[in-house]
Amino acid sequence: MVLAMSGSAAGPPPTAMARFVGVPLAPLATAPGEPPFATLYVSATVAVTATEAGSSHVATRLWMHGDPAELGPLYTAPVPHGVEVGRLDAMPEGHAIPAGISNGWTPVELDGYVPANAVVDSLDRVWKLAELNYETTCNDCHMPHEPNEYSPMQWGMIMPRMARFAKLLPNEEMSILKWLQNTSATSDTRR
């Protein structure tokens, strides 16, 4: 099942080891070679259940706001605590649409295939590169802000404007944004 009701928080199924999307954008398809129905962003937590023909079969639990039939952003948890880690772009034919739950947030389970090289065991290297890119690029115009100076939602509003000024490539922007949001989300200091 590609999209199903889930009763627990974001992340991989409890019996699987957590891995992460380690590339800025990973297309998620129902089968290798099929068109994607969703895109997972760097830092999305997944469980790899199999690898075949250059693709990894993954499962993850995420959250959507509103009616999943309308498609849209996928989050690690309901906002303001969650970080956007993907987008549901199409409803695979014949799959269940879960009913909404508290405050309009719906937990969903996604199951599909991503390129095998999109999955990493640790985000350490990805985050170090994003942090270095953030510090060197932003330092050209101003003193870089500490990630915990803004909430994940605020970084989502600030970063697109800054990326235009810095002429960042979309993949660079996505990696830096997710590093800022995840670092901000794990800090105790909030503005």
Model segments located where?
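SH3-family beta-barrel domains
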Residues: 4-35, 39-41, 49-54, 73-123
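Basic/aromatic-rich interaction segments and small domains that mediate binding to polyanionic partners
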Residues: 59-69
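Mixed-charge (acidic/basic) macromolecular-recognition segments
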Residues: 122-127, 146
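Short, flexible, mixed-charge glycine/proline-rich loop motifs
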Residues: 128-132
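The canonical Cys-X-X-Cys-His
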Residues: 134-144, 176
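Gly/Gly-Pro-rich "capping" loops immediately C-terminal to redox-active cysteine motifs
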Residues: 143-166
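C-terminal capping alpha-helices of c-type cytochrome domains
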Residues: 166-191
